[in-house]
Amino acid sequence: GDERASSRDIVLCLDVSGSTLPYDREVIDTYLELVKHFEGERIGLSIFNSTSRTVFPLTDDYELVTKQLTSASKALKGESQDDIDKMSDAEYQDIANWLEGTQNRKDATSLIGDGVVSCAAMLPGFAYGEANHANADRQRAASIVLATDNVVSGKPTYSLTEALDLTQQTKITVDGLYSGPKASESDQTTTDMKSAIESHGGIFLTQSNGASIDELVRDIQSRRDTDVENKAKSSMVDAPGLWTLALAVILIIWIVCAWRLRR
C-alpha cells in the first residue's frame, strides 16, 4: 500500500573479503527477488574490504537495481574454492573488476567498522566522524543490512561498536547477517558481533537454526517492514492535530448554524 511505500531506505553493506564472498552472492540473489515487490523503498549497495566502494547509490530505480544486482551475482557465481580452480580468465577478471576499489590499503582486510560508516554515509543525515543531530528526525526509516563474518585484519579507523554508536545517534538501524561457515558461529568474533548489533537495537541472525541466507534476509526484511507499518500507524495516533482541527471546524460550523437559527 501507499502508506508503506516510500517510507524506507535500505543499504546493503557487504563484506567482500575472501571468506565472505560465497555468502554475498546469496544475499544479492535474495534481494534480486525481494526488489520485485518493492513499492517506493530506496535501496543502495556498498561493498568493502580494507576500503569501500559504492556499487550503486540509494535509489528507487528498480530497473537499475536489478541490472546491478544481476551483474554482481554473475560476477560472483564462481565464488567457491572448487569453482575458483575451474574459472576462466574472463570469469576471474569479472570478479576482479567488481571488487576493484575495495582493497586499497596494504596489510589490511575486512575493516568492518569502516565499512559500516561508509554505508551509513549513503543515507541522508549522516556525516563522517559525527552524527548529524539536526537530521536525526528521519522522514524515512533507515536501515543497513550488514553481511560479514566480523573477522578483522589490520587496524580500522572505527571499531564496529564505534560505527554502531554513530549510526544509532542518527536513528539508522544496523541489522547483522553472519556470513561465514557454521563451524565458526560460536567463535568470539561472532558472539562479539551479535552483542554489538543487538545492544544497538539491531537484529542479528546466523544459519545455526538451519535457515538459509535467503530465509535470514527475508526475516530481516519482514521484521523491518512491520516496524515501518507500526510506526506509520502510531504516528497517526500520536499526531492528533488533524483530528483537533477537524473537530474545531465542526464546532465553529455548529456555533454559526445555531446562532443563525436563533436569529
What kind of region is each of these model predictions?
Residues 21-22, 53-57, 152-158, 184-188, ...:
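Extracytoplasmic/secreted cell-surface and envelope-processing proteins
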Residues 9, 196-238:
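Juxtamembrane amphipathic/hinge helix adjacent to a transmembrane helix
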Residues 3-10, 18-49, 56-70:
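…and closely analogous acidic/polar surface helices at protein-protein or active-site interfaces
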Residues 104-110, 114, 118-122, 126-143, ...:
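VWA/integrin I-like adhesion module and closely mimicked acidic/polar interface patches used
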Residues 44-99, 190-194:
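Short beta-strand-loop
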Residues 15:
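Residues that scaffold, gate, or flank divalent-cation-dependent active/transport sites
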Residues 1, 226-263:
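C-terminal signal-anchor/stop-transfer transmembrane helix together with its immediate cytosolic
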Residues 32-40, 70-74, 120-128, 168-169, ...:
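Sec-exported extracytoplasmic/periplasmic mature domains
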